[in-house]
Every structure is written in structure tokens, then in C-alpha cells.
Amino acid sequence: MLRRLDNIDVLCADLDRMVPFYRDVIGLPFVLPYDRGEGWAGFQAGDVTIFLIEVGGDAPTRRVPGAGPPGLESFAFAVDDLAAAIAELDAHGVTWAADVVESPWYRYRSLYDPEGNVLHLTVPDRKALGLP
């Protein structure tokens, strides 16, 4: 039935702060043409599309009735070299949420986007996770 994650929607208050972060700092390309007047931006992250959708103020209401508040707990980007990814993001002055964590399944470091959403840079231990 379910085959893979296709996209996620991140609700945000200030698209003008979020777009440069995901485009220039994280380095994700636009998946569709970006038009600020539309109130959203789509970025390609591997096989998953991340949509930033502006809410509040004059932005149109787009939330599903009964849905939780804007934002989400966290999401993760797999990287090949954690130290290199950390160094690259340090050069952009990102705000780190924690030091590197060594767990049985992942090595990761967490950071904040401009609206306080938590992103993780992860190096998964595919064998420990039971993945090929």
C-alpha cells in the first residue's frame, strides 16, 4: 500500500526567512518554480519534496481542520560525512541544538531552522536498522 514518503509540508510564519535557509544554507534545489506571491516553496531532498507553506497573517488558511499547530517535531537529512556537513553549516552560522549524538542506529547532530524547527543531520547504521 504505502511505498515511500513523497512530501512533507512545513507550515511557517515567515517564508522570506525560511526560503534562503533551505535554499542557500541547507542547499536544497527548488522542485517547482518559486513565486513568492503563491505563499509556498517546494524543495527537493532526495526522493522527498519539502513544501514550506506560509500561514498566519494575510496568508490563506491551509491547515486541515483539527490539525496541530504550525511546524513539526523534527525531520532528518542523511549525509555521507557528518563532520564535513557540520563544517559546511558552521560556515553559514547555523544554530546547533545539541552536540553530536552517538546512538545504536544513528550518528547525528541537530540544528534549528529560522523558525525553530529541528533538523537532524544523520549517518544511519544501515545494518543496525536492518536495512540493505
Predicted regions and their residues:
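Conserved A-loop
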Residues: 9
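Short glycine-/small-residue motifs
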Residues: 118-121
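Short, conserved charged micro-motifs
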Residues: 17, 82-85
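Vicinal oxygen chelate
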Residues: 1-5, 29-77, 86-112, 123-132
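Conserved beta-strand-loop-alpha-helix junction that forms the acyl-donor binding cleft
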Residues: 12-15
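Conserved active-site tyrosine of GNAT-family acetyltransferases
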Residues: 18-25, 89, 116
